Structure formats: C-alpha cells, structure tokens
Amino acid sequence: MIISKSFKAPLKFSVKSSTAPVISNHPPMENHPKRQRTTRLAARNLKRKLSHNTDGAPIVTQLIDIDDEPIDLVVAIRRHVEVLNSSFSDPDFDHEAVKEAAADIADLAKIDENVEIIVENGAIPALVRYLESPLVVCGNVPKSCEHKLEKDCALALGLIAAIQPGYQQLIVDAGAIVPTVKLLKRRGECGECMFANAVIRRAADIITNIAHDNPRIKTNIRVEGGIAPLVELLNFPDVKVQRAAAGALRTVSFRNDENKSQIVELNALPTLVLMLQSQDSTVHGEAIGAIGNLVHSSPDIKKEVIRAGALQPVIGLLSSTCLETQREAALLIGQFAAPDSDCKVHIAQRGAITPLIKMLESSDEQVVEMSAFALGRLAQDAHNQAGIAHRGGIISLLNLLDVKTGSVQHNAAFALYGLADNEENVADFIKAGGIQKLQDDNFTVQPTRDCVVRTLKRLQNKIHGPVLNQLLYLMRTAEKTVQIRIALALAHLCDPKDGKLIFIDNNGVEFLLELLYFSSNKQQRYSSSALYELAKKATSFAPEDSAPCSPTQQVFLGEKFVNNPTMSDVTFLIDGKQFYAHKIGLVASSDIFRAMFDGLYKERNAQNVEIPNIRWEVFELMMKFIYSGRINIAKHLAKDLLVAADQYLLEGLKRQCEYTIAQEICLDNIPEMYELADTFNASALRRACTLFVLEHFTKLSSQLWFAKFVKQIIPEIRSYMTDILTRPVEASPPTVV
C-alpha cells in the first residue's frame, strides 16, 4: 500500500509540493495523499528579500559597498572567502574581519540568486572549517567564545544546502556532518554566550537541509551519531532549539526505517507527544510532522505513538489556526484510522468528526484533501457513518466533487462510498441531491469514476423495505425540491417491481414531468435521464426495439398466390395495371376488406376494383404480407407502406413498418418522425420517438424548436410511462457490491 508522507522542507522553500496524488489499491478506491513539505520556514524565505541587518541598511548595498567604493558582487564574495581562508595560514589574521566575512556571506546566502556565486567561489569548504568548537586551546589559554562566527557559518551552509541537491553533497563532501553533530552535542557549554543556542539551532537546520530528500545523507547522519543529540535537544530549554531538533528528526525519519527505529528506541515519542500540546504553532507543527513521518508505513510505531498518548493532542490540532498543522493532523488521523485499526470509533468519540467536517470548507485545498482522506477512513465504521452524515458531512463531501483536483475528488468520493453503506444515510444522500451529483460525471481520474459507480450500486441495493418506505413518505410530505430529488433518484435506483408504487401510486411520474415542463435546461436533463432509465427498467425491451410477431389471422393462402389469376375472384387496378386477388384471404386479413366484400359496398360484387393513391410496388408488398404474413420492408418504401397499412387496418403490417421506420430516427428528423407517427396513429413509432428524445435530450436541447417540441410530447410521455409501469414486471436480482 503506497502512502506518501510529509517531509521537512529545507530553509529555502516556501512553496508547497504539488506532486500528483497516488491512489492505492487497498482499499480499492482509496487515495493515500502525499505529505507535503513544511511551511514552518516559509516566512523566513520571504524575509530573505528584505534586510536582516539590525541597523536597517539594505543587505546588497551593505555587502557591495566596501570602503565607500562600489565593487562587483563576485569580487566581494571572493574577498570574503579569502578572508575566511586566511585565518588558517596567517597566524596574525584579523579575527574581526573573519567574523564580518562570515556574517556577510550568511546575509548574501539569504538571497537565492547569490548562492550559486557563493558556491562557485569556494565558500563551502571555508565555512565548514569554522564549524569546529570555539573552545580550542591555544597553548594554555582558551580562545574566547566565538559562537556568532559558528552561527553565521552554519546559517550560510543551511541556506546553501536548501537550494539544490548538488549543494547538499558538496557540503557533505567538505566534511560537514561530523562537526555539525559535535555542535549538536554542545549542550551546556558556554551558556553565558548569547549566540550559543543559535549555533545549536543552526546546526540542526544544517541537518535538515543537507538530508532533505537524500537517503544516503540521512544514513550518514545516523552513522555519525547525529540522531541521539537531536532527540536530546527535544528537551532543550530554548524553544527554538526544540523546534529545530524536531524539524531535523522529521527530515531524517522520512522514508528511512533505520532512522525511525533509532528515534523510537531513544525514547523520542513521549517528548514529541508533549510538544503536540505546545501553544506555539511552529513547535507543534514540527512535532506532528515528525510523528507523521515516523508513523508512515510503520504499523508498530503507529501503535507506539497511540500508546504514548498522541491521539487526543492530534485531534486537538485539527482546530489549530495553522493550516499546515491542520493538514498534518488530519492525515495522521487518517493513518490512525487505517483499515486494520480498531480505534476508528475512539477517534470519533474523542471529537474528531466535527472539526474534520469543518475543514472540508477550508480555503486551503490540501487541508480539504487530508480531511476528506481522514473522513473516508473513519467512514468504514457503521457508527461513524451515521455520525458524519448527522453532522452535515454528506453535503460538504458532495460539494467537493466539483473540485477539479483529482486527489480531492477521489478522497471525497471514497468517503461518500463509505457513508453509502449505512441505510440511515440513504435519505440524506437523496435529499441533498447526491444522486444527481454522482451522475454528473465531472471526475478527472478513472478510479474516482469507478468509486462513484460502486457508490450508486451500494445505494441501489438499499432501496427496499424501511428505506423505500421512508423515501415514499418524504415524497408525499416533504417540500417540492425534496420530492423531485427523490423521484429523480428512485428512477435510477428502484427495483422495477416497485415502479408502479413509486411513480403511479405516489405520483413520481408527475414530479418528473413537471420538472421537464417548467425547469431549467439542466433540470430538464435530469428529468429526461430519469424517465429514460425508468422506461428501460420497466420493460425488458421497448416495442419499437424488436420486430413484431406475425399476425394472428387464420387464413394465409401463401406467397405463390400473390397476383396469381388461378382461382382469383377479384382484380385490383393500380396505376393501370391488374392485380389478381382472392377475397377469402383479404376478408380474413382486415376489417376494411371485410366491409368491402361482405358489406353493402359496391365492391362486393365487382370484378374489378380500382385502388387510387397507392403505388404498385407498395400495393404489391401489402398483398404479399396479407398472403404470407411476412415481408422484407425496404427502407424507402416503409413510410408509404405505413400509410397503406393504416388505411386498410393491417395492424401487423403497420407494426412492422413502424419498426423499420424507427431504425431511421436521428437527431435531424425527430420532429418529422413524430409528426408521421401522430398523423397515422403509429403508437409504436410515436413511443420510439419519445424514447429517443429522452435518451438524446442533451444533444437535442440546443435546437431552437426543441423547447416547444418537448412540451408537445409530454402527454405522450405520460401515456407511455403509465402504460409500461402498470404492466407486470419481474423483480430484478440484487446487485452485489
């Protein structure tokens, strides 16, 4: 199972990572969001563009104006490096000049564009050499404490390492790890020096920045003994040092199991848990980031963290004013609530659900993503499912489906999938318009679509018994908007055997038709889709979608007698041509022919009967049908043959003509087809047109004539739906989710 975790950002960065989400395969639709870089030092990055000098002079001006003479920046940096190097070869070096050079390079390094020049001019080796302890004995007299010099060198190295991985390696190759670890261990020495704590803090920052996203350097830090002093510094009196140590542990623990194990073995967890309760957002922010990285892909450490009492403080941080802390807390809650965890209910009981739902409305998209992730995990418990829905979680999660970011959509969809497992939530889903939202299909990745499909199937399997009764009650008593949403949802979700109960007995069809008649184009599309789905469910196939059966008349003389003078007792005249026929077959086929030859009409005793207004080839096909009960209807003759079949009341032939014509219905001819069906009372063709309109409503809605046409056919839609819903329907088998 792949879960990306947060990592400690180097000092340089102030922009959050935008790595694409990774969607795991367990649970099958759950997105495991990536931990983002900390923004603890984002403000510091912005300050680099400003002056850090206490006297207010602009940094660049101060650095490049030496002895009141402007000089080139490269030359200035080169001079500073030369001064730093001179102390190692000149016993009479100017100590103050060295301190000033280190401070100037540190200030220059605060501007990203300067770092490359600093590196190219050999500053890294010189800076690393000054990381040694200032308490070096010269003869029998110790040198004075020079913590500011060390602090500035450490600060410069940390800023340089933050720029690119190549600089990290240059610093390590210059031998920085060992002296940096020694600085971390300098606890209690020269406590009276004002910069002593700052040196330790900047040393921790070096660890943070050289180890960032560099597995080999993380391992080197552990091998050189760097983890133990960092753990000890978590209890340092200076809060800034605590924070820096937690940040360094956060970095070195990311995706490094050996480092994680050592941190836990050194008993860092209790102190990190205490730091979660700090009122300083920068402190609890680093602590929760470190804990998150320790927990990542480490079930045993996760249990240790919970046993150390982290659960309640983490839940409390969901209400932090720091967005990054909220995000980290939500992600950690999601990890605590993993599928194999038994503390989902405990998390809810301790008050996590309400702040998580509130976080769904955050302006920070990553906070939203992590809170949806946590709710998705918590929603795997039945009691939590009801609690999340009761606190308004369904509506907030549905709204997230409109967000275009794939990971946010997917986490929201997965949470909704969990909530749909509880029968108590079905009505809330539908009342909130959730079915329409799920069916809008505005999803950016296929796994989210798959998740939504399964959610709809899960809801569909619950539309029976008490759930159906509750929805029917609401459809009778609730406000009109809710009634319509229920009708729309049930059209897609109900069992066909309940169609009459819902849509005829409880007026569901009328709600859908009202929406089709009066509403906006979007609502009309919802209605047409619901009616089309309902029609498909109510019949295994529509009449126009299958060829009709042969007619049930008793006498078929056979095709060999078509236009055969043998035993012919009547001759039809069509287009001046003679067509030989037999009254016995004609009378048996149609009431019109029966009245013509058995009634009081003049044709009864006539030998020749003229047939006007019909073409020979059409009449011949009609006779073939009468004599044999079957014909192949050419598409170009179908309409004329339909007219003839209607005129002579040949219902079997008429049905076959309607079937043939229905195959030619398209977006361009639907008005003409419907008019043809209406003119000749071709009910099957008319219903084929109706079904086509419902199926292709969205495409047709752009036509200027369509709005009027829809209102014209609503009576036919009502008649059609009433007819098919009152037929006996076999129950559909349940869908397994």
Swiss-Prot record:
The keyword Secreted is assigned to this record: no
Annotated source species: Arabidopsis thaliana
Gene Ontology terms: biological process: DNA-templated DNA replication; negative regulation of cell population proliferation; negative regulation of DNA-templated DNA replication; protein ubiquitination; regulation of cell population proliferation
Subunit-structure text: Forms a heterodimeric complex with TCP24. Interacts with the origin recognition complex (preRC) components ORC1A, ORC1B, CDT1A and CDT1B. Interacts with DUF7/AIP1.
SUPFAM superfamilies the record matches: ARM repeat (SSF48371), POZ domain (SSF54695)
Highest rank taxon of the organism: Eukaryota
This protein's name: ARMADILLO BTB ARABIDOPSIS PROTEIN 1
Keyword presence, Protein biosynthesis: no
Residue stretches making up the BTB domain: 568-635
CDD domains on file: BTB_POZ_ARIA_plant
Domains: entry comment: The BTB/POZ domain mediates the interaction with some component of ubiquitin ligase complexes.
Stored PROSITE patterns: ARM_REPEAT, BTB
InterPro entries, alphabetized: ABAP1/ARIA (IPR044282), ARM-like (IPR011989), ARM-type_fold (IPR016024), Armadillo (IPR000225), BTB/POZ_dom (IPR000210), SKP1/BTB/POZ_sf (IPR011333)
Coiled coil: none
Tissue expression from the record: Weakly expressed in the emerging lateral roots and mainly expressed in the shoot apex, young leaves and flower buds.
Keyword terms: Nucleus, Repeat, Ubl conjugation pathway
Subcellular location: Nucleus
Function as written in the Swiss-Prot or TrEMBL entry: May act as a substrate-specific adapter of an E3 ubiquitin-protein ligase complex (CUL3-RBX1-BTB) which mediates the ubiquitination and subsequent proteasomal degradation of target proteins. In association with TCP24, exerts a negative role in cell proliferation in leaves, possibly by inhibiting mitotic DNA replication.
ARM repeat extents: 112-154, 165-212, 215-254, 257-296, 299-338, 341-380, 382-421, 456-495, 497-536
Protein's gene: ABAP1
Pathway participation: Protein modification; protein ubiquitination
Any single Gene Ontology cellular-component annotation: DNA replication preinitiation complex
